[in-house]
Amino acid sequence: MKKTVLSGVQATGSLHLGNYLGAIKNWVKMQEEYNCFFFLADLHAITVDIKPSELNNSIMEVLAVYLAAGLNPDKVTIFAQSMVKEHTELAWLLNCVTPLGWLKRMTQFKDKAGSDQEKACLGLFSYPVLMAADILIYKADIVPVGEDQKQHLELTRDIAGVINRKFNKEILKVPEVLISETGTRIMSLRDGLKKMSKSDISDFSRINLKDDNDLIHQKIKKAKTDHLSFVSYDQETRPEISNLLDIYSSLSEESLEQIIGNYQNQGFAKFKEDLAEIIITNLQPIRDKYLELMNDKEYLLKILHKGAEKARIRASETVNEVKEQFGFVI
């Protein structure tokens, strides 16, 4: 029997190169080997202020990128989180056994809430519990995530343990965390210490998957490096050039040593020019397919409804199992 893999991307804003290299590119490889559930995290998206029209468009955009990048809806289950009501039902049950102190230790809440945490919504605070429900409801064996989500996955494992100990029975599977070595943490093109993000004010901090070729060339040309005139890799002392090397390696599948050797006696200009071309070679087919899919909303909706119907079968089984243990009438 194939192991179950689950992962998702938040449906806010345009997806970028970091989303592709950190998640979607790896998912495409995994779909042949695993029973995969890939969702659009639209419930998580409303933990921050977002316009209804923007949310609706983002859901379609993320789905179109999933498909354009190579996810096959005949091989994997693709769905919007909000279309499977069991996610929120299980999240409530998990909320009722999760100690408040565990959530207070979550660093992402502090980062996203900013300086005035009293004004942050409860949904943002309990975000990790909904994330735990997203994972545990499908009894996922493996959850591929970026390094920044590792703390949330540890919480998920802890919550599963609480439920299993409470009822002295292995009801929820404790998932394994999968963090791949390359591409999981692509940094900003303007600051090598910050993760590439949809929320960054500067559009030149990221390569959006729908950027045209000229804009990609401009962004890479203006990408921050440092005062040294040679290519080398050191994340601590040279974070910006190291980030560009990570991108190059992830897309070309050449080792860092090979790439550095190729540009040993050349400056940044040639390296950046070649990097831009490699990015374009990888992203142009995705962008072309994405634009085609965005013109067929009826097809996209069909994929979402089909995926949600399939996901609900698995999700409802888990929720009923947990509810029965709590003592609810099923």
From Swiss-Prot:
Enzyme Commission (EC) number: 6.1.1.2
Entry's Gene Ontology BP terms: tryptophanyl-tRNA aminoacylation
Molecular-function annotations in GO: ATP binding; tryptophan-tRNA ligase activity
Residue interval(s) of motif 'HIGH' region: 11-19
Location(s), subcellular: Cytoplasm
Catalytic activity: tRNA(Trp) + L-tryptophan + ATP = L-tryptophyl-tRNA(Trp) + AMP + diphosphate + H(+)
Cellular component, GO annotation: cytoplasm
Coiled-coil residue windows: none
Residues where ATP binds: Q10, A11, T12, G18, N19, G146, E147, D148, I186, K195, M196, S197, K198, S199
Record's keyword terms, sorted: Aminoacyl-tRNA synthetase, ATP-binding, Cytoplasm, Ligase, Nucleotide-binding, Protein biosynthesis
Family annotation (InterPro entries): aa-tRNA-synth_Ic (IPR002305), Rossmann-like_a/b/a_fold (IPR014729), Trp-tRNA-ligase (IPR002306), Trp-tRNA-ligase_bac-type (IPR024109), Trp-tRNA_synthetase (IPR050203)
Residue ranges of the motif 'KMSKS' region: 195-199
Origin superkingdom: Bacteria
SUPFAM superfamilies: Nucleotidylyl transferase
Name of a matching Pfam family: tRNA-synt_1b
Binding site for L-tryptophan: D134
Task of the protein: Catalyzes the attachment of tryptophan to tRNA(Trp).
Oligomer and partners: Homodimer.
Similarity comment: Belongs to the class-I aminoacyl-tRNA synthetase family.
Protein name: Tryptophan--tRNA ligase
